[in-house]
Amino acid sequence: MAREYPLERYRNFGIIAHIDAGKTTTTERVLYYTGKSHKIGEVHDGAATMDWMEQEQERGITITSAATTTFWERTEDGSTALSPKYRFNIIDTPGHVDFTIEVERSLAVLDGAVVLLDGNAGVEPQTETVWRQADRYKVPRIVFVNKMDKTGADFFNCVAMIKDRTGATPAPIQMPIGSETELEGHIDLVTMTEWVWEGEDLGASWVLRPVRESLKAKAEEMRAHLVELAVEMDDAAMEAFLEGKEPDVPALRALIRKGTLALKFVPILCGSAFKNKGVQPMLNGVVDYLPSPLDVPAYLGFKPGDETETRDIPRSADDGQPFAGLAFKIMNDPYMGTLTFTRIYSGKLSKGDAFLNATKGKKERVGRMVMMHANKQDEITEAFAGDIVALAGLKETTTGDTVCDPAQPVVLETMTFPQPVIEIAVEPKTKADQEKMSVGLQRLAAEDPSFRVETNFESGQTIMKGMGELHLDILIDRLRREFKVEANIGQPQVAYREKIGRAADIDYTHKKQSGGTGQFARIKLTFEPLEAGSGFQFVSAIVGGAVPKEYIPGVQKGLEMAKENGLLAGYPVTDFRATLTDGAFHDVDSSVLAFEIAARGAFRELKGKGDPRLMEPIMKVEVVTPEDYMGDVIGDLNSRRGQIQGSEARGIATAITAMVPLVNMFGYVSNLRGMSQGRAQFTMFFDHYDEVPRAEAQKIIQEVSGS
C-alpha cells in the first residue's frame, strides 16, 4: 500500500493548557469542523468524544491523552478549500497537575503544539509548567486565546502575560472584534480582513469583511509590529522592508512560519471554542505555522547497550530509512486488549512484521494495527514515517521503549518519570477480588509509569503510590469500574523517606546452629550518607577472598531488602553507600542466604549508629487570591509549616508562592475555599525532599509504631 498523504501535509500536534482553559471543548470543535464528529460534544454534559473514560466524562477533566487522526482542508471563506487535505494527528492532553506525566509523554512525540489560554486568567501555573516542558523538547507552538466571550476576558493582557511569564516573544496574528458578550470574531492581521460569525449554524460559516474604520488604526499598528518581527527572519526581506517594500501575504505567512519553527516567536490567535468562533482559522494556523515531520531535525539515537549514550544514529521522516518508533502510551481496550501508542519516526511498519524492542532487547511482532479516533479504531495494514498508530498485542513493550528494525538497532529516547509522593493502602474484600486486583494493578502500572504498586512486607498490604490525591482517586475508580474489584481503601498517606545522618562502620556476625548444617556469615560494612537523588550504591572492596565472590550478591540483596523497611518508621532508606570491606565465612555453614541475613542484621544496627532521619516531600504551592484575603492565606500557609517564597501581582489578584510539606496540604482546597469565599485558587507541584523537624518526626514514628 502506498502512502496516501505526502509528509509535508502531516501535522502531529497536541492541544495543551492549564485545567479548564477549554482543551477538550476546542478538540470537540476541531473534530466537528473536520468532519470526524457528527455532533458537538460538550464537557459539561459528559458527551465529549475525546474524554472517553467514564471518570473523565463525570469529572469534566481530561485524564489520559486520547489520540485522534483527522483531516483539514485550508479554507478562508468557509466553502472553498484552498489546499489539498492535511492529515492531523492530534493528542488531547490533561491540564491537571497530577497528570503532568501524560503531557510529558505526549510532548516527546509531537512536532508542534497549540497552547490554549483562558482569555480571563491568561498564563496560569500549569501553563507555565507545560510551556517549560515544550521548551525542553523544542516544540514550536501557536497560542489560541480561548474563552474571549467570558466576563473579564482581555486579549492584550494575555499577550503581555506570555512575554512576562514565559519569556517568549508573542506575535499576535489576530485581534479580537469585541469581547465578552459582544465578541463577533477577529481581524486577521496578515490579510487585514475581518472574520465575523453571525449565523446559527454552530460556527460552520462566517463572513469576511474589510476592517471597520473604528478598529483600523489599532489593527494597522499591530500589523506593523508583526511585519517587523517577521522580516527579521530573512535578510532579503529585511533589506526590502528597509527600502519601504512590505512582504505580500504568502511571503509574510512564510516568514511567520520560519520564525515559529525556529522558536523565535509565537503566533497568537483568539476566539471562543464554546461559542464556535475562531476554531477554523486556528486550524489554518496549524497548517500555516506548525511543522510537518519534514521540518523537524533528524532524531538522533544511540546504539543499544552504549552506556555513554552517544547520539550518532540519525532517524528522519523518510519511508526508505530503517523502521524506528517510540512507544509513548499504553492503554487497555476492552475488545483489543493492550494497545501501545507508537510514533513512527522513520521507515514503515506492516501488519505481521517482526521488530526489535531496542530498549529491552526483546523481539515483538505486530498483530493488529489501528488508527485511533478517541476510543474508536480503524484497522490498517501499514503505517509510515510520521504516523501515530496503536499496536495491539505487544507483550514486552512499555512506555518510553524504542521499537525498530532488528537489522538496524537504535534507541531513540530514555524517558524519565517522577517519584510518587502520596500513597494509599488498598485491601481486596474477597479472595476473588484479590486475583482481579492483582491483574488490574499490573495493567494500570503498565499504562502509567508515575504510578507504582508495592507490598508492605510487614503488614502484607498492597500500597498504591501516585502523584496526588486525584491521581489515586482515578486509579481506584478504574479498579472498580474496569476490573470489578471491591476493595477497602485506606486514608492517603505521605510517601516519607529515611536517610542516615552520619557514616558508620558495622561489624556483624550471623551464626545459627541447631542440628545438621548451620548458618555462618560475618561482614564488615561502611555506610555513608550521599547527596539527595543519589539513591542506594553498593560497593565491594573485598580483597584476598575474605568473602567468596559467590556470596557477595547475597550481601547486596540483603541490604536492598532491608532498606525498603526503614530504620525509624518503616519508610525506604535512600541516598547512601554501603561498602563491604571485610568478612569471614565457614566452609560448610556459609551460604548466600547466610550472608543475606547478615546484611539485614548489619543494616538494622544503623538505627543506633547511623543517626537516621525522616524525610518528607515538600510541595511548591502557588495560591492566586484577591488582595482582601492575602493576609489570611499567608497566615494559613505559615501555620502549615510553609515557607513563603514571594508574591507578585497577577491582574487584580496576588499570587503567593510557598514551600509547604505535603502532609499539611491534605484538604487544603476546602480550607482555601472557605477562607476566600471560593475566590482563591491554588496549584501544587512536588519540589524536593527535606528533613522532618525532630518533634514532628517523633510523632510520626509513634503513630506508625502504635506507641
Swiss-Prot record:
Q: Name one GO biological process term.
A: ribosome disassembly
Q: Is Plastid among the key words of this record?
A: no
Q: What residue stretch is flagged as signal peptide?
A: none
List residues binding GTP: 17-24, 92-96, 146-149
Key words of the record: Cytoplasm, Elongation factor, GTP-binding, Nucleotide-binding, Protein biosynthesis
Cellular component GO terms, alphabetically? cytoplasm
Q: Per the annotation, which location comes first and is thus the protein's main one?
A: cytoplasm
UniProt domain tr-type G: residue ranges: 8-294
InterPro entries reported in the protein's UniProt record: EF-G-like_DII, EFG_II, EFG_III, EFG_III/V, EFG_IV, EFG_V, EFG_V-like, G_TR_CS
Taken from the record, one Pfam family name reads EFG_IV
Which residue pairs form cystines in this protein?
Answer: none
Chain ranges passing through the membrane = none
Q: Which SUPFAM superfamilies match?
A: EF-G C-terminal domain-like, P-loop containing nucleoside triphosphate hydrolases, Ribosomal protein S5 domain 2-like, Translation proteins
Q: Which Gene3D superfamilies match?
A: 3.30.230.10, 3.30.70.240, Elongation Factor G (Translational Gtpase), domain 3, P-loop containing nucleotide triphosphate hydrolases, Translation factors
According to its UniProt record, where is this protein located?
Answer: Cytoplasm
Q: Which GO terms describe its molecular function?
A: GTP binding; GTPase activity; translation elongation factor activity
Family named by the database record: Belongs to the TRAFAC class translation factor GTPase superfamily. Classic translation factor GTPase family. EF-G/EF-2 subfamily.
Q: What does this protein do?
A: Catalyzes the GTP-dependent ribosomal translocation step during translation elongation. During this step, the ribosome changes from the pre-translocational (PRE) to the post-translocational (POST) state as the newly formed A-site-bound peptidyl-tRNA and P-site-bound deacylated tRNA move to the P and E sites, respectively. Catalyzes the coordinated movement of the two tRNA molecules, the mRNA and conformational changes in the ribosome.
Q: What's the name of the protein? A: Elongation factor G
Q: What is the lineage of its organism?
A: Bacteria, Pseudomonadati, Pseudomonadota, Alphaproteobacteria, Hyphomonadales
